[in-house]
Amino acid sequence: MDGDRSKRDSYWSTSPGGSTTKLVSDSERSGKVDTWLLILAFTQWALSIATVIICIVIAARQGYSMERYSMTVEALNTSNKEVKESLTSLIRQEVITRAVNIQSSVQTGIPVLLNKNSRDVIQLIEKSCNRQELTQLCDSTIAVHHAEGIAPLEPHSFWRCPAGEPYLSSDPEVSLLPGPSLLSGSTTISGCVRLPSLSIGEAIYAYSSNLITQGCADIGKSYQVLQLGYISLNSDMFPDLNPVVSHTYDINDNRKSCSVVATGTRGYQLCSMPTVDERTDYSSDGIEDLVLDILDLKGRTKSHRYSNSEIDLDHPFSALYPSVGSGIATEGSLIFLGYGGLTTPLQGDTKCRIQGCQQVSQDTCNEALKITWLGGKQVVSVLIQVNDYLSERPRIRVTTVPITQNYLGAEGRLLKLGDQVYIYTRSSGWHSQLQIGVLDVSHPLTISWTPHEALSRPGNEDCNWYNTCPKECISGVYTDAYPLSPDAANVATVTLYANTSRVNPTIMYSNTTNIINMLRIKDVKLEAAYTTTSCITHFGKGYCFHIIEINQKSLNTLQPMLFKTSIPKLCKAES
């Protein structure tokens, strides 16, 4: 074993080249490692110190930058504040300056310029309107017109159906339509407003009423109020009367029994100007003065007064009055219905009914036209024709309705609807039933009355609701009707539905034999007087305005009130 170890030691101690190799001991190797570890540790320490120094330097520099940044931001804020304050001050000064200028212009400059321009335009228009050929142009300077689709109801157009036959329906019952009423009233407790007259033209309407300041006596001094306006639709899409201009005529002129016509952009009013009471007037020869008033939409008014000698009368009259209800406009003339007493009675046979009446003859009917209470004068209806009504001085001609065509002369109304003229007269005599028909104004003048059995009016005991036999009497009340069908067989009206008393005003839609649909205004005891009904269409749908003199019983005075209904027309399907 020892020999082998000596051989092994000899091998490791000699190099292959034969030189001797010195072996490194374990202690020597350990010393070198420690040296390198020491060097590495020192290097790490040095790097750490350098890193700390670098961080300190960087931090110092950053602190300086932050301080400079803060100072810069503060300086910018200060500068921004100064600029803001400067701009605000400048803007405030500019705004104040401009506001002062605007205020000055609005309060002073613009009104002055507008007034000047308005005066210039008005002067130019008035200068132009003085020329005859520009009259129509000047009339149209104010654009006032009914709402689109609204027109006076024309029976030939209304009373038809796309299929089937038209008829008045009882279901549902008519009801009052909501909306305002702007009819003129009184400012005194005892004031009385009478004789409403309404005319609806193609563009505007005219409404007139008589205001007596104390009580309701006809001869009492009174104002006459004439309104012009147009028909609009309210928020419920129902029609309303909207007055545009109103004129009140002097109380000292004492206009009475006025009738109106609306045509173009003007309203025309024909009135009597009595100086005595009615009975005294009938007992004397000649008539009281008439006056024609003209009002336009600018509020300008003109009046023409006519004495008995200035009127072309076809017969001598002791009394003559416009008929309260509306008149009509035709080519170049206005026509008002009137009534009055002839100085000398006409000869001929009047409208009469003998069948079913005891001890009655034609003479009974003829004599019934001569009213004892009015001095025995024969009371007739007339047409009052105002010719050349656009001229400086219109002319008036009076034509008597032949007694052969008429009942007792009385208040009434004319309507021109389409090509036909309709006439209504108050049933003041023995004939109590509704008097409405078609008037032919050509020569000879004729009336085709439509017999109505269902509608009548209250009257005195001898001539009450049911009376149909001839006798002398003067009674009744003005309750006109509006024709819905071309033959005036179907009508809209407000009747005082009572036998002898002026009570129970009731809106009625009726044909010749039956009351189809009706609405009582309040109750059977409500007192009323004159009523007038006018109807329109809105794109074919029919509506009626009803104006009723209602007795304000707590004040014992009359005041017209406006009501509106929808026409209950339906179409019967063909079988």
Swiss-Prot record:
Comp. bias intervals (Polar residues): 11-24
Disulfide bonds: 192-216, 258-271, 357-469, 463-473, 535-544
GO cellular component term, pick one: host cell plasma membrane
Membrane-topology annotation of the record: Single-pass type II membrane protein
EC number, as in UniProt: 3.2.1.18
PTM field: N-glycosylated; glycans consist of a mixture of high mannose-type oligosaccharides and of complex-type oligosaccharides.
GO terms for MF: exo-alpha-sialidase activity; host cell surface receptor binding
Virion surface side: 59-575
Any single Pfam family the record assigns to this protein: HN
Reactions accelerated catalytically: Hydrolysis of alpha-(2->3)-, alpha-(2->6)-, alpha-(2->8)- glycosidic linkages of terminal sialic acid residues in oligosaccharides, glycoproteins, glycolipids, colominic acid and synthetic substrates
Residue ranges, Intravirion side: 1-37
Biased composition (Basic and acidic residues): 1-10
Region (Involved in interaction with F protein): 59-140
Stated family: Belongs to the paramyxoviruses hemagglutinin-neuraminidase family.
Record remark: domains: The C-terminus (head domain) is involved in binding the cellular receptor.
Subunit structure: Homotetramer; composed of disulfide-linked homodimers. Interacts with F protein trimer.
Name of this protein: Hemagglutinin-neuraminidase
Organism: Sendai virus (strain Hamamatsu)
